[in-house]
């Protein structure tokens, strides 16, 4: 029911950014089915069905979809046996939708790296270890992700099916 409210407010839909996500560790030994559903539903299922709900509106406006993926869609994060595969699924969904929805709708993704730390926090030593693995030697800002999304939406009319890493160069040195 989100889309009817959105289109009622503005009467058209040009852009869908799938940014909602759940992130937490799921070690295999203690993984529950509820955790599986929580992570898959928020990181893969919800974006798919939001795209489906927005389809006719985005076709009418030659709109664009941007999915917020994660650099860990390509390289697993220890003890996150569900999150990584969910984001990898979102990366493949991004490419599949680009193939299926063109030429009317462009579909791309942005894969953030160290931008915001988990709500529960992580030890300072771990933060610094992650930052040392980036070429730019610093964490990013939410504005860095927003600028990449804005580029894909506004300045990239010939780009579809791509996922831009916004990770300070971390994925270069995996």
Feature locations, PLM:
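Alpha-helical segment proximal to the catalytic Tyr-Lys
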Residues: 56, 98-103
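Active-site helix of classical SDR
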Residues: 51, 86, 94
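Substrate-binding pocket helix/loop in short-chain dehydrogenase/reductase
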Residues: 27-28, 35-40, 130
């Amino acid at each position: 029911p989100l889309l009817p409210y959105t289109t009622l407010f503005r009467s058209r839909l040009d852009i869908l950014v799938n940014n909602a996500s759940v992130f937490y560790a799921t070690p295999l030994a203690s993984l529950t089915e509820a955790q599986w559903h929580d992570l898959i539903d928020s990181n893969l299922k919800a974006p798919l069905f939001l795209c489906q709900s927005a389809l006719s509106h985005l076709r009418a406006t030659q709109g664009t979809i941007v999915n917020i993926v994660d650099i860990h869609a390509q390289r697993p994060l220890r003890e996150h046996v569900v999150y990584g595969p969910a984001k990898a699924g979102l990366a493949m969904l991004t490419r599949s939708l680009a193939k299926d929805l063109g030429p009317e709708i462009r579909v791309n993704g942005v894969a953030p790296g160290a931008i915001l730390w988990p709500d529960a926090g992580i030890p300072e030593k771990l933060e610094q270890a992650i930052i040392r693995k980036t070429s730019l030697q610093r964490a990013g800002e939410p504005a860095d992700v927003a600028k990449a999304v804005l580029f894909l939406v506004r300045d990239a009319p010939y780009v579809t099916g791509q996922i831009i890493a916004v990770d300070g160069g971390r994925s270069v040195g995996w």
